C-alpha cells in the first residue's frame, strides 16, 4: 500500500460523518467516483420488516430517473433487485410534503402495509432522512447508487465475522451483507474504483463491517474520522470532543439534527445546526445535564442524535438542499426518541462564491510526542544519563508467585529436506503450528501473539500469504516481524514464535484490528491485529488483571501508509512517531503500564546503532512523563458498547467509563510514585538486519497491563547470581488473590 491517489466510492447515509470523511478523501487528492447508499427496503425478507419503511420514492420512478441521463452504463450489466442508479442532473420526483395532508399518496409510494412512522433504528445504517438521499446526485454532481437493505442484524458481536453466517447455518443474512451487491454493482460500472470511505468515528461495530466488505472486494477502506476525538486539536483551549463539529463548520458543512434519542436531547433540538459552534455548544450543554456530554455523546456516536447534511464546500456541493418548514413533520416513537419525516425537499443554486478553507488535517504528533521530538537530539552526555536512569530500578525483597497459563512455541522448518522455497518453508511451519495448537487442545483463533523472524525481509510477501491461511477469524494475533540475515541457522529462512492460552484458561479475548486508513495509527491490512487482550489468572482463578500484546509499530504516516520524508530530523521523527503509534494503541486498549519494550534498528555501524539506542531510550523515558503530567483520556463508548457491554450500560456517570492514563502513575506503589524514574519500565535496543518497509525503527512492547488497582504495581530489577552481568526485570502486580510477576532478562555492559 502506498500514497497513490485512489478512486473512492463514498458510502453516505446523509449524515455529517460520512460526508466529512468524503471531504477528507478529496483533501488527500483522492477522486470520488460514486456515492453509495443503503435504504430501508420492503417485504418480510428485509430488515425493514422488523421496524422500518421503504423509501418514499416509487421504484419505477427512481429507475426511470436513473436512466434519463446515461452514465455510460453497459446494457448487459446485471443489477440486484431494487438497485437504483441516479445520475447528476436527474430530477427525481419528490413525494408530497406532510404539511399538504396528502399522506395517503406518501404511504402508497412507500408500499402497501409498510409504516413510515418508524425508523429502522439499525446499529449499522442511518436510515432516518433517507427520503432526501436521491437529491445528493444532483447536489454533488456525482452518480448515486442505492440498494434496499435486506436481512437483519444477525451478528451482534462487535467485531464482524462474515464466515460465521455460513458456519452457523444462519437462514437470514446479516444486514451488513447488503453492502456487498451494492458495491459490486458500482465496481462493475466504475472499474477504476479501488477504495471505499465511511464515517466511522468510534464505532468498531460499524468499522469492522465496512472493512469486511471492502477487503473482500479488494477495496482500500478509508476512515479518516476514526478516533478523531483523541487526535490533536489546533488549540489547547478547544475541547477535543467537539473539535470534529467545529472542523465541519469551518469547511461549510451544514448538518442538521433530524433525530434525537437521548436523555438531555428532545424534539426542541430537532433541526439544530449541529455543525456550528453555537449548535454544538447547545447540544453539549443539554447532554451535560445527564452526565453524558463527553467524548462519543457530544458527537452522537452513542446514538444520542442523527443528522442530515444539506450543504457543504463547493468542492463537494454544487447545489444546496432546502427543506421548507412545512416539510418537516415530527414523529414521536416514545422512550425519548423523536425524528423528522421530511418532504418537499428542493435544490437551490449556490450564490455565495466565498471559498471555504480546506479540511483541517490533524497534526502528525500529539502535544506529548511533539515535545519529545522537539527535545531530540540531546547532547550525548544527557542521552547517556537518560540511558543510565533506566537501570536505576529498585531491588525490593519479596517472594512473587507466578502461574503461567500461556503456551509458547518456537517453530522452524525441518532441516535436511533439501533446498526449499520460502513459500514451502512457510507452509511447513504453518502446518507445524496447526499440529501444535491442535495437540494442545486450543484453537488457532486463540493465539494471542506471534514473532516472525526472517532471513530476508524481501521474502515477506510470500510468507504473509501462507501465514494468513491460518488466521481467518476476526482479531488475529498481534505480530512483530524482523529480519536477522545470516544470524539465522544455516538452511533456515523463517522462524515463528507464538503464544496462546492453555485450554483451562478463561477464553475471554478482546482484540483491536483497524484495517482502515485514518489519522490515528497505521492500518493493519492482513492477518495481524494491533492488539490482543486476555485475562491473567493464577492457579486457575481470575486476578482481575489483563495482559495486552501489541503488534510491532513502524513509523508509517497513518493517513498515507508511507514513511515520513521530512528533512528535519528524519531519524528522530521515525523513532518518536512509531512510539506514538504504540501509545495510541495502548490508550485505546486501556493499558495502564508497560512491562518492558525493545526498539529494533536495522544494521548500521556501531556509532549509529549506539546513537539510535540512546535516542530511543530518551524518547521512552520522556514519553512516560511524570506523575504531575497525568491526564485523563476518556472518549466515551459507541452505540454497540451501550447496548451489549455491561461496563457502558449507563450514560449517566462518565466516571464509570473513564480510561486510565498511560502511564497510570497512581497504579505505582507510593514509594515509587515518589521516585518516578524507578518505575519507568526497562527499554532495550536490538540491532537486526532489516525491518518492514525499510523502516528505521520498530517498537515492540513486551506486555501492556490493565486492571491494575491503585498503588499495587511495582518495578524491580534483580541480579542473576549465576549469570554475571545479567539482570531480570520484574513488573509485579498485587491483587486480592495473587501477585503476578512479568519478567524480562537482560545483560548490562559496564
Regions found by a protein language model. Give the residues of each.
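ATP-dependent adenylation/nucleotidyltransferase module used to activate substrates
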Residues: 2-257
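Short, catalytically relevant binding-site loops at active-site mouths
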Residues: 202-205, 227-231, 262-265, 535, ...
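Ordered, small/hydrophobic-rich secondary-structure cores
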Residues: 238-239, 243, 247-305, 312, ...
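Short, structured patches in soluble enzyme cores that scaffold and shape functional sites
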Residues: 225, 257-262, 311-314, 486, ...
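Internal, charge-rich low-complexity segments
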Residues: 42-74, 158-161, 229-234, 318, ...
Amino acid at each position: 500500500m502506498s500514497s497513490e491517489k485512489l478512486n473512492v466510492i463514498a458510502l453516505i447515509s446523509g449524515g455529517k460523518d460520512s460526508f466529512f470523511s468524503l471531504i477528507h478523501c478529496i483533501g488527500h487528492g483522492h477522486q470520488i467516483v460514486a456515492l453509495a447508499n443503503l435504504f430501508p427496503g420492503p417485504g418480510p425478507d428485509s430488515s425493514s420488516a422488523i421496524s422500518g419503511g421503504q423509501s418514499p420514492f416509487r421504484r419505477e420512478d427512481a429507475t426511470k430517473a436513473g436512466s434519463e441521463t446515461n452514465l455510460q452504463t453497459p446494457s448487459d450489466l446485471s443489477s440486484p433487485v431494487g438497485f437504483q442508479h441516479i445520475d447528476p442532473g436527474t430530477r427525481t420526483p419528490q413525494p408530497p410534503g406532510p404539511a399538504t395532508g396528502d399522506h395517503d399518496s406518501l404511504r402508497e409510494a412507500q408500499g402497501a402495509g409498510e409504516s413510515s412512522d418508524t425508523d429502522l433504528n439499525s446499529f449499522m445504517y442511518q436510515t432516518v432522512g433517507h427520503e432526501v438521499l436521491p437529491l445528493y446526485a444532483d447536489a454533488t454532481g456525482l452518480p448515486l447508487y442505492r440498494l434496499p437493505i435486506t436481512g437483519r442484524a444477525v451478528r451482534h458481536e462487535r467485531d464482524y465475522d462474515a464466515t460465521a453466517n455460513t458456519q452457523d447455518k444462519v437462514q437470514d443474512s446479516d444486514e451488513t451483507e447488503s453492502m456487498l451487491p451494492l458495491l459490486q454493482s458500482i465496481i462493475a460500472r466504475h472499474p477504476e474504483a479501488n477504495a471505499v470511505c465511511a464515517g466511522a468515528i468510534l464505532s468498531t461495530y460499524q468499522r469492522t463491517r465496512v472493512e469486511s466488505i471492502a477487503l473482500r472486494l479488494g477495496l482500500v477502506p478509508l476512515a479518516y474520522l476514526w478516533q478523531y476525538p483523541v487526535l490533536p486539536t489546533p488549540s489547547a483551549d478547544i475541547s477535543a470532543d467537539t473539535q470534529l463539529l467545529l472542523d465541519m463548520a469551518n469547511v461549510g458543512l451544514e448538518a442538521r439534527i433530524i433525530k434525537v434519542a437521548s436523555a438531555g436531547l428532545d424534539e426542541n433540538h430537532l433541526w439544530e445546526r449541529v455543525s456550528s459552534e453555537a449548535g454544538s455548544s447547545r447540544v453539549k450543554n443539554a447532554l451535560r445535564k445527564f452526565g453524558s456530554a463527553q467524548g462519543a455523546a457530544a458527537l452522537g456516536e452513542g446514538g444520542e442524535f442523527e443528522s442530515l447534511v444539506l450543504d457543504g464546500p463547493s468542492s463537494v456541493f454544487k447545489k444546496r438542499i432546502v427543506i421548507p418548514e412545512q416539510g418537516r413533520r415530527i414523529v414521536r416513537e416514545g422512550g425519548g426518541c423523536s425524528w423528522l419525516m421530511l418532504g418537499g425537499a428542493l435544490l437551490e443554486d449556490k450564490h455565495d462564491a466565498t471559498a471555504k478553507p480546506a479540511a483541517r488535517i490533524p497534526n502528525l504528533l500529539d502535544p506529548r510526542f511533539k515535545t519529545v521530538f522537539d527535545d531530540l537530539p540531546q547532547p550525548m552526555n544527557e542521552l547517556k544519563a537518560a540511558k543510565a536512569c533506566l537501570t536505576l530500578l529498585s531491588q525490593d525483597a519479596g517472594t512473587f508467585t507466578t502461574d503461567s497459563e500461556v503456551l509458547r512455541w518456537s517453530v522452524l522448518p525441518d532441516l535436511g529436506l533439501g533446498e526449499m522455497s520460502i513459500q514451502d518453508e512457510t507452509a511447513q511451519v504453518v502446518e507445524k503450528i496447526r499440529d501444535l495448537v491442535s495437540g494442545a487442545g486450543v484453537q488457532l483463533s486463540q493465539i494471542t501473539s506471534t514473532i516472525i523472524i526472517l532471513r530476508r525481509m524481501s521474502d515477506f510477501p510470500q510468507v504473509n500469504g501462507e501465514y494468513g491461511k491460518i488466521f481467518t477469524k476476526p482479531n488475529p494475533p498481534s505480530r512483530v516481524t524482523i529480519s536477522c540475515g545470516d544470524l539465522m541457522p544455516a538452511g533456515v529462512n523463517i522462524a515463528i514464535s507464538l503464544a496462546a492460552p492453555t485450554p483451562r484458561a478463561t477464553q475471554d479475548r478482546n482484540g483491536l484490528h483497524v484495517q482502515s486508513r485514518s489519522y490515528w495509527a497505521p492500518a493493519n491490512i492482513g492477518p495481524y491485529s494491533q492488539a490482543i487482550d486476555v485475562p491473567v489468572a493464577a492457579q486457575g482463578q481470575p486476578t482481575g488483571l489483563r495482559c495486552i500484546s501489541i503488534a510491532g509499530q513502524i513509523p508509517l504516516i497513518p493517513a498515507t501508509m508511507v514513511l515520513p520524508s521530512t528533512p528535519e530530523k528524519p531519524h528522530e521523527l521515525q523513532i518518536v512517531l512509531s512510539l506514538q503509534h504504540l501509545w495510541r494503541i495502548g490508550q485505546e486498549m486501556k493499558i495502564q503500564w508497560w512491562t518492558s519494550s525493545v526498539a529494533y534498528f536495522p544494521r548500521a555501524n556501531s556509532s549509529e546503532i549506539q546513537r539510535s539506542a540512546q535516542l530511543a531510550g530518551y524518547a521512552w523515558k520522556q514519553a512516560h512523563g511524570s506523575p504531575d503530567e497525568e491526564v485523563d483520556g476518556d472518549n466515551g463508548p459507541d452505540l454497540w458498547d451501550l447496548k451489549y457491554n455491561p461496563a457502558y450500560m449507563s450514560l449517566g456517570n462518565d466516571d464509570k467509563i473513564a480510561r486510565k492514563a498511560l502511564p497510570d502513575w497512581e497504579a505505582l506503589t507510593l514509594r515509587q510514585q515518589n521516585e518516578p524514574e524507578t518505575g519507568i519500565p526497562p527499554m532495550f535496543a536490538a540491532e537486526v538486519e532489516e525491518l518492514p518497509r525499510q523502516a528505521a525503527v520498530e517498537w515492540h512492547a513486551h506486555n501492556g497491563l490493565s486492571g491494575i488497582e491503585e498503588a499495587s504495581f511495582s518495578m524491580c530489577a534483580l541480579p542473576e547470581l549465576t549469570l554475571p552481568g545479567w539482570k531480570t526485570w520484574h513488573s509485579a502486580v498485587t491483587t486480592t488473590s495473587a501477585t503476578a510477576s512479568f519478567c524480562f532478562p537482560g545483560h548490562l555492559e559496564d
